[in-house]
Structure formats: C-alpha cells, structure tokens
C-alpha cells in the first residue's frame, strides 16, 4: 500500500498543475468517464484531477489496503472497533432484507425489528392522539434532549424532511447552556409537550442536566404524577430511567454495536419517526440499505462510497489538502455539513494507527460547510481565490417541493453549476483584462486591476445530483458518506469507530466544576486556568 501511495505522491506535483480546462477540451467524454450513478443519484468527479492513471492506482490502493476485506468484516459483525471490543453494525439497523446478522453467534435482527416495531407503535399513538398528556390533551410538541450523535442526526434529518412532517412539531435541545432549553420551553405548553431523553447510559451530563430542567417544567405545571405522561427515553439504563420517573413501556433501547454518530437509524431516530411517520421512516431506512448493498456488491470503479473515499484520501494524504467543504444547495440540508463534521472528524480525527504507532502523513480533514447560495456570500471568496486549495462537494436535487417556486429552484441549480464550473475553469489574466477594457477601462489601469480578477481555476469539486430530497434519498446520502468515512479510515489505518478524544475534556470538566462553584481551590491547575477562574468569579453575580 505504501508503495502505491508513493507512486501517487510522485505524480502529485504534475497533478496539482493539471489544467482541467485542457483536460475537458481534450476529452469530450471526460464527464461520462469520470461520473458514476446509483439509480437517480449521480456522482460527478470529472472536475477533480483524477485521470485514468490515478484511478488505476486508487483502485489498486483499495485492493492492497484491504478495504474490501475490512468491509466484509464490518458487515459480518466482527469487532472491528477493537479498542472497545465492539462490532460496528449500524448497517443492521437498516437491514431491510432481514438476512441474519450475527454478533457473538446471535442473530441481532429479531431485536432490531422488535425495537423498530415498538417505536412505530409509540409514534403512531402520539401522532394519532391516542396517547395523551396528563390532562387529556393530545401532544402537539416533541422535544428531544440529547447531545452529539443523539442530537445531530435527528436535528439534521428532521429539518431535511420538513415537507414530510405531518406529526407534532419537533424541537431539539442539546447544549448545557441553559439558554438553549429556556428558549425552547418558551415555545411550548406543558400539557401538550412530550420530552424524549436520549442517553444510552442516562448519565451524560449535558443531557441529564437538561432533562432535569424539563422534568421540573412538567412537575411544576402539572404535578409529579404527570411526569410519566410527558416523557419517553432512548436508553439501556432501565434502572436510572425508572428512577427518573419514566414508564418502562416508553423506553427504547439500542446496542453497544451502534456508535452515537451512526445512531440515527436506531431508536435515536424516534423524534424523526414521530415527525414523518413510521412509513416514511421505513423509506429512510430503505435508502440507506440500498447504498449498503451497492457498497458491498459494486466494482470499485462503479462504487460511489469507494470512489468518494478514495478521492478523499487522495486529496488529503497525497495532495495534502487539509479541509473539505460540504455545500448542499438545499436550505433544508443546512445541518448536513455539521452532521458530516461529526461523522467524519470524530471518526477519522485520529493520530494513532491500528498498530498503536503514529499515523504517517495525515488522517481525516477538517470538514465544514453551509448551504448554497448562502455560502457564496460568505466564504466562497477564499475557495475561489485563497492560497489554500479546498475540495468542494456540491449537492443539488433536480426537483423541489414547491412547484409554484420553480423559477427559484432553477436559479439555485444555475448557481451550483456555475460554482463548480468557475472552480474548474477560473479566469486568466487575459480574460480578466479583456472584460475590463470591453467596459471602457484604459490599458494601464486594466493591467493594474486585472490581477485581482484572476482565478487560477483547477480547484477540485465533486457534484451530487438526485431527483428529490425524499426520505429514501436522504437515507441514501447519509449512508454514502458513512461508508466514505469507513473507506478513508481503512486507508489511514486507524480505528474510525472509537472517540477517545472526547473523553479527556469531560474528565477535566468534572474536576473543574467544584472550582467554578467556589467549593475548591484552583490550586494545582495551570496559571491560565487559575486566571480564567478568577476572572469569571469576579464577574459572576
């Protein structure tokens, strides 16, 4: 594998100098040769520097790097998350074929289906008004309390699928900052509100602090006995859930082989199911399952997650590009970049290989983005003319949900196509100068101004096109990126499924709380921390 990486690196200088304009001019079939599709989902990577030789090397990299072997280990239930001795089976949660999936010799599918059925029954009862609040009123608002994977997925997907909402209004609380829950509680009435507390262990500090605030909100307005009518939980800690006052019939579990950032397919998706209904939630799972099958069966050169991961690895570890921009041209996908930020950076932000040795080269990139066209008026300037190359990944649906606003969607499409073309083509000095002189500017001034209007071009982008942002399409898109992260992680030779970097800050915060509360001295902490504690204490009222 290292030899192939070195071969790729030996071409890096030439690759960076690749003139994509010339490549398209020389090859009328470049788009068709460097784009692949799964049904209506098209991935165009022709505007990257990938050529026939690089693609062959990338395919060899996947083969020699053991990506296919590791892929089968994941799907078959092997404990590939070896630092926690856990299988990685979020794919089982959307295994619509019901093919047995074994963990320690036991088929997990009966349990998966049982939880899904219980979720569906509960969601239907809330949506229909059969399950009411303590005063006999139907539930009109559902507030999910969670953080990280228990929040980012449900928030993102619920917003993305807004056209399919026909259930109670959905709200989400995650931050331990009291302002977050305070602002949400102002929007609802206690007698018509259901809280879902999402915490596997029922000990997550942020979640349980907010849950206690929510409990007080209900108990103060409706009495202690009302708590059981206004809460549900997604957890495996049944004793703690019961102590909180939540009926065991309203508790939905999931398993150690489901990582938080991969948990939207599990009971963590309950608020989404309540919003869009069990049938649409099933279609969401169907879309992901279609990508799972494609990922397992399609040849590497026709395999969307494989190609996306290989190109991502190439950009990061061969060409050295430190970030990637996720740019969905869909306002309802406004939280998708943040969702992928966690998925990618928590998975592949590692510095140690599976052998326990330091990673050679780079691991995961910084992932960020905003929906178009908002981003065009914020940070695209740097993507077009900055000194860092930032690979861009665009997404656009051919059809929107507002037929009366078709012209606006056409404007959206024209913008995303223009951006990918502009990044590729750029603008030469001669073109910039001619544009100025055509407007009447004299030669001397045009020579001075034109350099500021030059775009180097050759800036890589990938564009995804699909029919419409349905539950099926969203499930497909998420699964595509999940498997992309997996492919890159295998090539980085890291464990993509633990997150020890999250733990240190938690431990230190626990120790600092008594200091912040004034119960203990800051002595023993560094001088900066001591100084900050003192400054905050002085300002506190």
Swiss-Prot record:
Pathway: Carbohydrate biosynthesis; gluconeogenesis; Carbohydrate degradation; glycolysis; D-glyceraldehyde 3-phosphate and glycerone phosphate from D-glucose: step 2/4. It comes from the Bacteria. GO terms for cellular component: cytosol. Its main location: cytoplasm. PROSITE patterns: P_GLUCOSE_ISOMERASE_1 (PS00765), P_GLUCOSE_ISOMERASE_2 (PS00174), P_GLUCOSE_ISOMERASE_3 (PS51463). Signal peptide: none annotated. GO terms for biological process: gluconeogenesis; glucose 6-phosphate metabolic process; glycolytic process. SUPFAM superfamilies: SIS domain. Belongs to the GPI family. This is Glucose-6-phosphate isomerase. It comes from Rhizobium etli (strain CIAT 652). The lineage of its organism: Bacteria, Pseudomonadati, Pseudomonadota, Alphaproteobacteria, Hyphomicrobiales.
């Amino acid at each position: 594998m290292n030899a192939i990486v070195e071969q790729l690196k030996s071409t890096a200088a030439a690759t960076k100098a690749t003139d994509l304009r010339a490549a398209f001019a020389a090859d009328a079939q470049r788009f068709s040769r460097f784009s692949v599709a799964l049904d209506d989902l098209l991935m165009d990577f022709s505007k990257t520097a990938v050529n026939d030789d690089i693609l062959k090397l990338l395919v060899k990299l996947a083969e020699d790097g053991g990506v296919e072997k590791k892929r089968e280990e994941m799907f078959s239930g092997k404990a590939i998350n070896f630092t926690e001795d856990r299988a990685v089976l979020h794919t089982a949660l959307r295994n619509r074929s019901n093919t047995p999936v074994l963990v320690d010799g036991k088929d997990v599918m009966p349990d998966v289906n049982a939880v899904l059925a219980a979720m569906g029954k509960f969601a239907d009862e809330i949506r229909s008004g059969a399950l009411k609040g303590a005063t006999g009123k139907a539930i009109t608002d559902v507030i999910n309390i969670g953080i990280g994977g228990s929040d980012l997925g449900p928030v993102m997907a619920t917003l993305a699928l807004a056209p399919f909402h026909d259930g109670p209004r959905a709200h989400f609380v995650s931050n331990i900052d009291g302002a977050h829950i305070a602002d949400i509680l102002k929007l609802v009435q206690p007698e018509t509100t259901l809280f879902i507390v999402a915490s596997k262990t029922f000990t997550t500090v942020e979640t349980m602090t907010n849950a206690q605030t929510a409990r007080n909100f209900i108990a103060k307005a409706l009495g202690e006995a009302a708590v059981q009518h206004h809460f549900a939980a997604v957890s495996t800690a049944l004793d703690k859930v019961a102590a909180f006052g939540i009926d065991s019939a309203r508790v939905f579990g999931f398993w150690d082989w489901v990582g938080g950032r991969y948990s939207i397919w599990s009971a963590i998706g309950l608020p989404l199911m309540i919003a869009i209904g069990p049938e649409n939630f099933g279609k969401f799972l169907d879309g992901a399952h279609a990508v799972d099958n494609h990922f397992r069966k399609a040849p590497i050169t026709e395999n969307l997650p494989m190609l996306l991961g290989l190109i991502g690895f190439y950009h990061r570890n061969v060409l050295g590009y430190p970030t990637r921009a996720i740019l969905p041209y869909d306002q309802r996908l406004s939280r998708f970049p943040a969702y992928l930020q966690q998925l990618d950076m928590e998975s592949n932000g590692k510095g140690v290989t599976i052998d326990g040795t330091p990673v050679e080269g780079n691991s995961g990139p910084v992932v960020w983005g905003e929906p178009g066209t908002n981003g065009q008026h914020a940070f695209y300037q740097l993507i077009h003319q900055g000194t860092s190359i930032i690979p861009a990944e665009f997404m656009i649906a051919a059809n929107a949900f507002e037929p009366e606003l078709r012209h606006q969607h056409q404007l959206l499409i024209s913008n995303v196509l223009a951006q990918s073309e502009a990044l590729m083509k750029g603008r030469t000095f001669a073109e910039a100068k001619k544009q100025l002189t055509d407007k009447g500017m004299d030669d001397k001034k045009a020579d001075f101004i034109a350099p500021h209007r030059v775009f180097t071009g050759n800036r890589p982008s990938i564009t995804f096109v699909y029919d419409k942002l349905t539950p099926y399409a969203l499930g497909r898109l998420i699964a595509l990126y999940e498997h992309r992260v997996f492919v890159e992680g295998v090539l980085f030779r890291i464990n993509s499924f633990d997150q020890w970097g999250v733990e240190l800050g938690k431990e230190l915060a626990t120790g600092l709380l008594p200091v912040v509360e004034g119960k203990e001295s800051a002595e023993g902490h560094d001088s900066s921390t001591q100084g900050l504690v003192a400054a905050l204490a002085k300002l506190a009222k």
